[in-house]
Amino acid sequence: MKTRAQAALVIQQVLDQGQSLSAVLPAAQEKVAPRDRALLQELCYGTLRWLPRLDAAVNEMMDKPLKNKSRIFHYLILVGLYQLIYTRIPAHAAVAETVNAVKLLKGTSLRGLINGVLRNFQRSAEVILLRIDRVPSIRLGHPEWLTKRLRQAYHDEWEFIMEANNQRPPMWIRNNSQRQSRDAMLARMAEAGINAVAGEEGEDCILLERPCG
């Protein structure tokens, strides 16, 4: 719950206040439990990475956007959708934790709306994504101007180039064995929906299957 609320607040700072993610994320990570810091990073980076696609999905489900003081709840919905589309967090947990975060953000009156939007997406995800993905820049997560330039320069390979550009290099992290065993750390990451495996390069080495950032 707190992790989703912090993710929405970080995204608001980046999009509405023009702050850099690298500048605001560390302070937010200090406000959540150590075991949730990697998840917070994944939610922030991932939501911003796929912002146009997530925004398009919201626009398919809502007639009127959330504005002004309610804008933070738009970002919370984006965080919820990111979990449903791009992570292996169980859908029921992703929805419940995101909806519960509404209370922390002091928007209890919007709880029903946010719950409805996320559950609507659960029911109709295939149709919604099929509709918005007709626009290549949305489907492939690139700005429209860059998509046009790539299509003009690489007539037959532009989609392959954009798909390759979305791939992230492997990310390795080091477990602090003085605090917990590597197996315990892997178990905590699995509970948070972060897929990782033990690395062969060292006793404390962990490889993230879905890098953050």
Predicted segments with their positions:
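Class I Rossmann-like S-adenosyl-L-methionine
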Residues: M1-G213
